[in-house]
Amino acid sequence: MENKKTIYFLCTGNSCRSQMAEAWGKQYLGDKWNVYSAGIEAHGVNPNAIKAMNEVNIDITNQTSDMIDINILNNADLVVTLCSHADSVCPSTPPHVNRVHWGFDDPAGKEWSEFQRVRDEIRERIKRFSEIGE
């Protein structure tokens, strides 16, 4: 019997930040949470996001870039927006769905070191959530 909660990471294109968050979420929260990610649009998984996660031995090549699924959104226990655009244009969530904003810079189109920095910041934030629940 599965009593896992559902966490849903959202950003604009489901390309970089939410993909990395989904991967870290599965690593740190997978025992207790079903972990999903999506975007306002689906831009495809950024090759540098794949490369950044490979650098820490996490393979996200099988993750897909998806638009927001209203069923997952409406049934999630926690929705986490990762960029201000997703926070402002995300469809409304029902009152029983806890929604929080964890803002991270968009590394797309920037230096490689930005992908590494954002990857590590997302890891630390999700690790903290796994340890203290906030």
Curated annotation (Swiss-Prot):
Gene3D superfamilies: 3.40.50.2300. GO terms for cellular component: cytoplasm. It is an enzyme of class 1 (oxidoreductase). Disulfide bonds join 11-83, 83-90. InterPro entries: Arsenate_reductase_ArsC, Ptyr_pPase, Ptyr_pPase_sf. One of its GO terms (molecular function) is protein tyrosine phosphatase activity. The keyword Ubl conjugation does not apply. It is found in: Cytoplasm. It catalyses: arsenate + [thioredoxin]-dithiol + H(+) = arsenite + [thioredoxin]-disulfide + H2O. It comes from the Bacteria. Its EC number is 1.20.4.4. It holds the Pfam family LMWPc. Signal peptide: none annotated. The active site is at 11 (nucleophile), 83 (nucleophile), 90 (nucleophile). Keywords: Arsenical resistance, Cytoplasm, Disulfide bond, Oxidoreductase, Redox-active center. One of its GO terms (biological process) is response to arsenic-containing substance. Catalyzes the reduction of arsenate [As(V)] to arsenite [As(III)]. Belongs to the low molecular weight phosphotyrosine protein phosphatase family. Thioredoxin-coupled ArsC subfamily. This is Arsenate reductase. The lineage of its organism: Bacteria, Bacillati, Bacillota, Bacilli, Bacillales.
